[in-house]
């Protein structure tokens, strides 16, 4: 199990990403636009740097919904490989069963 503080930190990051997504996208569009002037581009870079560090989507980490485990995460199910296997063995995942050949 991951520490509660780690789960809370990830939840806070997700909240910040959602809050600043539009502003961050607008600033990145100005920076990427070749028609924008150098001054506008530079102002956009400075404003982007002034945003909270955790508002960047790349700082988020996928974690298991049940345990908070950061490694072995399967996006399709939102679970780590360990919890997915346990749920599959109990028959709680529709259409998924242990391989046999």
Curated annotation (Swiss-Prot):
Protein name: Small ribosomal subunit protein uS14
InterPro entries on file: Ribosomal_uS14 (IPR001209), Ribosomal_uS14_bac/plastid (IPR023036), Ribosomal_uS14_CS (IPR018271)
Quaternary context: Part of the 30S ribosomal subunit. Contacts proteins S3 and S10.
GO cellular component, as recorded: cytoplasm; small ribosomal subunit
Family note: Belongs to the universal ribosomal protein uS14 family.
One Pfam family from the record: Ribosomal_S14
Gene: rpsN
Function of the molecule: Binds 16S rRNA, required for the assembly of 30S particles and may also be responsible for determining the conformation of the 16S rRNA at the A site.
Single GO BP term: translation
GO terms for MF: rRNA binding; structural constituent of ribosome
Keyword Ribosomal protein: yes
Keywords: Ribonucleoprotein, Ribosomal protein, RNA-binding, rRNA-binding
């Amino acid at each position: 199990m991951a520490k509660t503080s780690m789960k809370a930190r990830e939840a806070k990051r997700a909240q910040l990403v959602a809050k600043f997504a539009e502003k961050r996208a607008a600033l990145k569009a100005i920076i990427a636009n070749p028609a924008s002037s150098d001054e506008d581009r530079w102002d956009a870079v400075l404003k982007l740097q002034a945003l909270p560090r955790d508002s960047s989507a790349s700082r988020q980490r996928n974690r298991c919904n049940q345990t908070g485990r950061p490694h072995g995460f399967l996006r399709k199910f939102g679970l780590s490989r360990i919890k997915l296997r346990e749920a599959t063995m109990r028959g709680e995942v529709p259409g998924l069963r242990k391989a046999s050949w």
